[in-house]
Amino acid sequence: MNRRYEKPPPLSVSSKGKKKHFVNHTAPNTPGNYERTQTSPTLSTARSHEPDDKLNYEIFSILESKFLFGYEDPRLLWIPQSPLRPGDSEAGPSPRSPLTPNGVVLPGTPSSSFRSPRGRICVLSIDGGGMRGLLAGKSLIYLEQMLKEKSGDPNARIADYFDVAAGSGVGGVFAAMIFATRDGNRPIFKAEDTWKFLVENAEGFYRSGSGSGGGGAGAAIKRVIRSGSGSGSSSVTAATAKLEKAMKASFADLTLKDTLKPILISCYDLSSTAPFLFSRADALESDSFDFRLRDICRATWAEPGTFDPVRTCSVDGKTRCVAVGGGLAMSNPTAAAITHVFHNKQEFPAVKGVEDLLVLSLGTGQLFEVNYDYEQVKNWRVKEWARPMARISGDGSAEFVDQAVAMGFGPYRSSNYVRIQANGSRLGACGPNVDTDPRAENVKKLTEIADEMLKQNNVESVLFGSKRIGEMSNSEKIEWFASELVIEQQRRSVRASPTVTLKQAVSKTNRNAINATLTLISKDR
């Protein structure tokens, strides 16, 4: 997955060997038109991966079909269909069926109707967002609590029940924490440790009273526009040193191979001007793709204006990147995680489509500072637009991914895909620096908003219809999701063929023994 991440052009696709060509037939090969080869240009050492981005191509095909033809015409649009159940017919579901004639899952539908006989790959995605990561941390704590309750195992951890985790920014750090291991058997950190980590280190990472204002893409834009300067100041250097110290204390010399399951953590590589994904699957194949977890977390959290960029390299020194924050690359990494599952046939051989996935995406809240009306904004200049543009850029990109993924799931979007997101707050507008304010008052307010978020009704994305308020609260959705995770793990023990065949890392002791043996063999020759 160490690759440049691009949206495929929607017109035509032709394949030649292991490269995918996307061609725009409406214009000649001039700058700005498509006649390009999608390879893995991020790294000179990158291996050849599956060429076509299945989920993204289907998503953008849906978008094209909608705007050109209208999505209601089934002849012009692919939408995944659930298998017919007793009482259904080709003409449509029976009255008792949880599907409407348009293929939409009715609220409250038991997901047992949609459980794939092949099993489902369980995917966790965590957004970036600076101090707003406290909301995702609270969701993780509640999820782990529910897993313990549903499984009856007081030692249950999130890593026991998910097959893949992806994160950006602070979400990437959380993903690394809950999947990191020292003994190859149990995770080092509990879910509550993620929340504590952010609270305890916030004052060292962020400056009280800072006007920088945010984590993720929007926040970075805001800091650059407002300050007119980037890294290099004494305050940024001090914050960077504290971040590196905290990461070293948490992860020591653990690498991507020292994680229990596949993880994906994003950053933006300035040297190749492309998003970069650190992937455990790649690390297990070559040391050239194995990075230290402390360097990965440093890279994904390198928010411009708050922390310095970082030059990081693989454990063998052959692969390098100059990284800034993962939120600039993808503030919501859900689509990247799903695409990884579709492409990783070695570890997920049974996956055929979205019906074989069970995805939980944790947002960090849409916490608007203030609402605007037309009369207020119509005469704004660049200075007045700086803050709203930053917020729109950050939150808007994350929500677009949510909308696109929901469309990709079609009728399975209520049974196989859950997004947990704060839908505003009754506690009043947040301050302009909510994402970077480490003071106790801001931590207290974010904690209260997180508790309020769990009580709010879950908001679902609807096909080209904005949002829909669901019948279940976010806490009820998480509880339901935990039940599904436990059921999936129980069913795996009785299936004839494995749902997941995870590659195992070779221990350092075994690696040294293997290297010593190879050295002796070479000497004998």
Swiss-Prot record:
It is an enzyme of class 3 (hydrolase). Residues 26-46 have a biased composition (Polar residues). Gene3D superfamilies: Cytosolic phospholipase A2 catalytic domain (3.40.1090.10). GO terms for biological process: defense response; lipid catabolic process. The active site is at S168. Pfam families: Patatin. Specifically expressed in roots. Keywords: Hydrolase, Lipid degradation, Lipid metabolism, Plant defense. Disulfide bonds: none annotated. Residues 124-338 form the PNPLA domain. The keyword Hydrolase applies. Its EC number is 3.1.1.-. It comes from the Eukaryota. A motif (GXGXXG) lies at residues 128-133. The keyword Hydrolase applies. One of its GO terms (molecular function) is hydrolase activity. InterPro entries: Acyl_Trfase/lysoPLipase, PNPLA_dom. Residues 1-50 are annotated as: Disordered. Belongs to the patatin family. The nitrogen atoms of the two glycine residues in the GGXR motif define the oxyanion hole, and stabilize the oxyanion that forms during the nucleophilic attack by the catalytic serine during substrate cleavage. PANTHER family: PATATIN-LIKE PROTEIN 6 (PTHR32241), PATATIN-LIKE PROTEIN 8 (PTHR32241:SF25). Possesses non-specific lipolytic acyl hydrolase (LAH) activity. Hydrolyzes phospholipids as well as galactolipids. May play a role in disease resistance. This is Patatin-like protein 8. The lineage of its organism: Eukaryota, Viridiplantae, Streptophyta, Embryophyta, Tracheophyta.
